[in-house]
Amino acid sequence: RRAGADFMLIDSGRLMGGVSGSTTGKITALHGAVFAGLIRRFGTARTRAYYEANTAAIRKYHSVCDAVGCGIEDRAAYVYSRDNAEKIKKEYAALHRIGAQAELSGCPGLPFGVAAAVKLDGQAQFDPLEFAAAVVSTLPADRIHEHTAARAFAGCDVLTDRGKIHARRVVIATHFPVINSHGFYYLKMYQHRSYVLALSGAPRV
């Protein structure tokens, strides 16, 4: 929209219908202990590019949140192991190899001990529902069509249960693939949902 593009946004249900509210959405370049393995598989240069792209995305989130009036907080991210300190040390070395300012650290506030942990400052958290609502509020209402399911794709034609949409470009922004192409990811992925309970008077973990 900022670039002046004409667009249409469709959703098979309600916008933000599956987004968790009042949660801590984590925005980080630290996606588990993956960097040592990425260097082995793809090399240092490509792994550094991956890390820098994720770091740039954090900055972009800050910029968008400022623009739409959504709160965002700086936070540190941690990767830890309860029983494999060597794995964490290798991850720490890999992060330094690609230029990340990581440090070996404990995990304060956990109700259990850890063998080792890597801490990376400059990450962020926000409320994803608040963010999505703020972004949607900047869009013209007549370009948003809820309860409109995409049933099939033919080039840049999107066939819905309410008619056909033609566009120069189509962006499929679903968490789960809706077309059976591009690597057959629908065969490799599965959906997962987790829950958290806050209990009063329960024994400590």
Describe the function of each predicted region:
Residues R2-S22:
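Glycine-rich FAD pyrophosphate-binding loop
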Residues S22-A53:
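Glycine-rich active-site loop/strand segments that organize a redox cofactor
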Residues A33-R40, H62-A134:
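Flavin (FAD/FMN) cofactor-binding and adjacent substrate-gating region
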Residues Y92-L95, A117-R169, A173:
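Helical element adjacent to the flavin cofactor pocket in flavoenzyme catalytic cores
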Residues A5-F7, A102, V170:
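Hydrophobic anchor at the start of a short beta-strand
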Residues G163-R204:
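Central helical "cap/lid" subdomain
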Residues A45, A49-S63, K90:
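A non-catalytic, amphipathic alpha-helix used as a structural packing/dimerization or gating element
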Residues A3, I98, T138:
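Conserved dinucleotide-binding and phosphotransfer motif residues
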